[in-house]
Amino acid sequence: MTVRKTVAFTKKSANIFFHILTKCNLSCRHCYINPEQQGKSNLPLKTIKAWLEAFSHDSPTANVIFLGGEPTLHPDLDRAIKYARQLGFRSITVDTNGYLFHDILSRVSPREVDFFSFSLDGATRQTNDGIRGDGSYDACINGIQKAVAKGFAASLIYTVSRLNIHELEMMPSLLNDLGIERFFIQVIGLRGKAAASST
């Protein structure tokens, strides 16, 4: 397996993790958004653009990562991406659970998005869906395949816990089969649902 070493994240780079909404179609056991806040915030495009402009003045070569919630639920994500690209940020990534709402793959191009970064928390359907919800494994795999087929670079985020650490050794072959170019292993932050969970 060959995993590309990206220039997007380096020791000296600035990374802007931009939460554009808190709405999500899933209810993951380790979600970092407090349950009472989920779905309550949805930034209008005007506000997103204003923040992107502010970020570009302070860190013009930063990497922008659009987050949620599920960012593809935002109806103006494509316009936010295009504006971020216009401002000249170093790279643009969209974190997603793979459902890819609003036909986002047809509304932006691989020239505009450096990576779609998919969240998958198990090498098997049983493990992932036990954490992220029924059907989420198939949706994520399908989303990855669609993105790669359209020429987008795909990365994968694996949030490790006692529920899925045993499947980490199974991931390399899956990454290779899916054409994943970056793989991130992250630990659970003790906030949101995770703070009250035993995962």
Residue spans of the language-model regions?
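Short glycine-enriched, charge-decorated loop/helix-capping segments at active-site entrances
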Residues: N34-N42, D129-G135, S198-T199
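Radical SAM enzyme core and accessory elements
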Residues: M1-K11
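Radical SAM/AdoMet-radical enzyme domain recognition
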Residues: L45-F66, H74-L190
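A C-terminal junction/extension of Radical SAM enzymes
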Residues: A8, I165, R191-T199
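Conserved alpha-helical segments that form or flank metal/cofactor-binding pockets of metalloenzymes
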Residues: G69
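Canonical Radical SAM [4Fe-4S] cluster-binding loop centered on the CxxxCxxC motif
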Residues: F9-K46, S59
